[in-house]
Amino acid sequence: MPLLRIATRKSLLAMWQSEYVAARLRMLCPDLDVVLVPMSTRGDEILDRSLAAIGGKGLFLKELELAMLRGDADCAVHSLKDVPMDLEPPFMLAAVLSRDDPADALISNVYLSLESLPIGARVATSSLRRQAQLRFYRPDLRLFDLRGNVNTRLAKLDNGDYDAIVLACAGLRRLGLEQRMTARLAPPEWLPAPGQGAIAVESLTEDARIGTLLAGLDDLPTRKCVIAERTMNRALHGSCHVPVGAYASYEVGGMRLQGLVGCVADGRLVRAELCSAKDEGDMLGRAVAQCLLDAGAAELLAATA
């Protein structure tokens, strides 16, 4: 029986996502023996500093990529929003699965919406993109960094450390925690991270056998949408150091891409959106990035450099 080993982080959410990929692979190839290879990453272990301060979201990938290079794993499963815009050789995105809910969720045990939070309420999120949008809509809020797995973050809310926190809807749904969502923060008013809600599988470019197996998981509409989002972010030189949001969707007549660049310090947001009848997400991504730059995003990006 052929064997496929999936490198994964050890968190409950990462394990759920990897088990989901494994189950899909077993359905596609019933004679395939799929096993998980759980491991810790530096991004999971260093929780007292922001991701921007310790090197960015690539810290969630490094150990998993090393496992593939050593021959200890054949592929790795990630939340696509955590995958750097440019994967260095010899790695590639072998599959992007059908997207789950791309929105963020406001979670509070007392208040029912972002608007109903009291003046000066304490809201926690580690994402600069979320902080910038919170600052835009509610400049009075006190914002705090919050890292750790989903249950750790919920526990801090439940302990009274904060009045509300912001998490990704997809992660909550995958863990069966939909009931904790107080309000969805969703497009067009609120934009997610590029690729948010999608699961990605990374493999070695040179491994054609694994690449062929994983290609059966790929959802082409999702891949095209996230290509547009990630191309926009790449054109802006975006990273976890920069508050960038993007969301692409198929509508009658073609693909629509909405993008924003924000500033946490003063809550400024620069927005742009375009529709394209051509099925070329990379061109649309570059076009929206240029619109953002023309509208003043260059100044905000320079402030974060």
Curated annotation (Swiss-Prot):
Q: Name one GO cellular component term.
A: cytoplasm
User: Keywords for this entry?
Assistant: Porphyrin biosynthesis, Transferase
Short name of any one Pfam family annotated for the protein: Porphobil_deam
Q: Which domain of life is it from?
A: Bacteria
Q: In which pathway does it act?
A: Porphyrin-containing compound metabolism; protoporphyrin-IX biosynthesis; coproporphyrinogen-III from 5-aminolevulinate: step 2/4
Query: What InterPro entries would the database entry show?
Result: HemC, Porphobilin_deaminase_cofac_BS, Porphobilin_deaminase_N, Porphobilinogen_deaminase_C, Porphobilinogen_deaminase_C_sf
Bound how, and how many: what does the cofactor note say?
A: Binds 1 dipyrromethane group covalently.
GO terms for biological process, alphabetical: protoporphyrinogen IX biosynthetic process
Q: Name one GO molecular function term.
A: hydroxymethylbilane synthase activity
The keyword Transferase belongs to this UniProt entry's keyword annotation: yes
Q: Where S-(dipyrrolylmethanemethyl)cysteine occurs along the chain?
A: C240
Reply yes or no: does the keyword Transferase apply.
yes
Q: Kind of enzyme, top EC level?
A: transferase
Question: Its catalytic activity?
Answer: 4 porphobilinogen + H2O = hydroxymethylbilane + 4 NH4(+)
Q: What is its EC number?
A: 2.5.1.61
- Additional free-text comment from the UniProt record: The porphobilinogen subunits are added to the dipyrromethane group.
Tell me the function of this protein.
Answer: Tetrapolymerization of the monopyrrole PBG into the hydroxymethylbilane pre-uroporphyrinogen in several discrete steps.
Q: Please report which protein family the annotation says this sequence is part of.
A: Belongs to the HMBS family.
Tell me the subunit arrangement. Monomer.
Question: Could you tell me what this protein is called?
Answer: Porphobilinogen deaminase
- Encoded by which gene? hemC
